[in-house]
Amino acid sequence: GRRRGPAETGYMIRDQEGTVMPTTYAHDLFGREVYRRLPSDMKGVIRRHGDLYRIGLHGPDILFYYMVSKNPVTQFGVDMHREKAKAFFKEGMSQVRRNKDEALLAYLLGFGCHYMLDSACHPYVNRMAEEGVIPHIVLEKEFDRVLMEETGRDPDHYYPACGIVPRMEYARVIHRAMPLVKTVNIYISVKMMKLLTNFMVCDDHGRKRRIIGKLLSLGGKSAGSVIEHFMTAEAVEQAKAPMPELERLYREAIPETVEYLKELYTLREGAYHLSARWNRTYNG
C-alpha cells in the first residue's frame, strides 16, 4: 500500500540540543550471542538475574531516555561514553566482592557487553560520519534493521525494548554501579526507554507520529529535527557500502567479549588486574 513516511517507521528521537535516543536491537542480540558462549557458572549468574543483564546490555545509553531536553542525568550518560571504562568496572566489581552482590555482577556483565561492542564498532562508525559517508546514528539504526531482518524480525513491527523490565529494585542495583545518579532517576530512565522505543515502532499507520509531533510542538521542539532520524520504510542507500565492515566488527567482537567477560568475572574473587582492553572509551 501507501509508502510510509520516515517518522512512521522508526524508534529514534533527537532533541534540538542533539541528544540521541540510540537504537537497541544490536546490543540485545549481541548480549544473547555472548551469553550462549559463556561458561555454565557465568550463565547461571545471568539466568538468575536476567532482567538486570538485559538492562546492562544498554550500558550508559539508558540515561539518554531520562528526558527529551538537556539535563544532568543524560549528560552523565554522555560523559561516561567519553571516559575510559576500566575504573567503572573495577569499582563495580569491588562492590560485588565486598557485598557478594550477584545481582550487580549480572548487571556489570551486561554492561561489559555494551562497552565491548561500542568500543569495537564506534571508531569505524565515527570515521564513516567524519568522511561524510553516512551520519553515525543513521548507520547504527540501519545496522539494527539489517540484524532484525537477518534474525526474522520485522523492523516495522518488532518492539526492541520488549525485554526491558523497569523496576525500582533493579534501579537500586544499578544505582550501586552509578551512585552519582539517583535511584529514582535510573528507574525513570529505564521506564522512559521502554516507553519511547516501543512507542516509536511503526504499526499504526502514523497515529503515534501525529501524537508525538503535537507533544514536541507543545514543548517547543521542532518535529523535523526528530523526524529526520527515524528509520525509513526502505533501507538507506548510503548504509549499504559500510555495512559489511560493520557486520565483520560485530561478529569479531562476540568471541573477544566472551574472553574479556571471563576476565571481568574473576574480579568477583579478588582485586585482579584488568587488561588494557578495558582501558578504552566507548568510542574506542
Q: PLM features: residue spans?
A:
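N-terminal leader/auxiliary helical segments
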Residues: E8-L108, M116-G284
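Aromatic-lined, polymer-binding surfaces characteristic
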Residues: C113
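Extreme N-terminal basic, low-complexity initiation segments
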Residues: R2-P6
